[in-house]
């Protein structure tokens, strides 16, 4: 089974990239983040014609996530159990049947956080990671097939930082988000629960592959970016991971998202 995660940075602005992903990868499951479209305005017909069951959880102008599945899910959940009406639309989950049993897929657009001293955004990022941790610990078991994918807005290791050493030090010094010690600790807790970073498992030393590139500084041209889009798998999936990758070809299309799609294939 093949899973693709893509921060599309506006679904209605980039249908050409979604179509290209489907044509090239033929994924079983696609997780989209930052769809930026209210549920009532979601282009359901246009997306469904690509051959998928389509589930979405969005709001006007910001955030928003969607799951596209070949197989009909057993169940779909939008948001965390305790989310109120005011909660940002950032997470969607599904139980997807497979020969391995039902796979719990969690697709998230994790808060960016901005910087350590931001009074709202940084605590919101911490809370989101805590909510996910709580969900894993209370609702799921790590010996079952679980896949968390999405724009997680954290570079797990220094190998995932490609913005230059001076910028790396400056970001740490000024408290800018993406690889602060606190953020690394949140990520570490997820991994300790029983998840594996599929890309890093397959590429333990790779230090020149990234998934986000800044528009303004034309980071993609120079391969200056961060690997912040991840597929984290529990052991039953991780040990069956056949291939992973980051699709630079899709990122190099006309009018692209600032993110590249990331993907993993599992032998199930």
Curated annotation (Swiss-Prot):
One of its GO terms (molecular function) is endonuclease activity. Keywords: DNA damage, DNA repair, Exonuclease, Hydrolase, Magnesium, Metal-binding, Nuclease. The active site is at 109, 151 (proton donor/acceptor). GO terms for biological process: DNA repair. The record marks 259 as: Interaction with DNA substrate. It catalyses: Exonucleolytic cleavage in the 3'- to 5'-direction to yield nucleoside 5'-phosphates. Belongs to the DNA repair enzymes AP/ExoA family. Monomer. This is Exodeoxyribonuclease III. It comes from Salmonella typhimurium (strain LT2 / SGSC1412 / ATCC 700720). The gene is xthA.
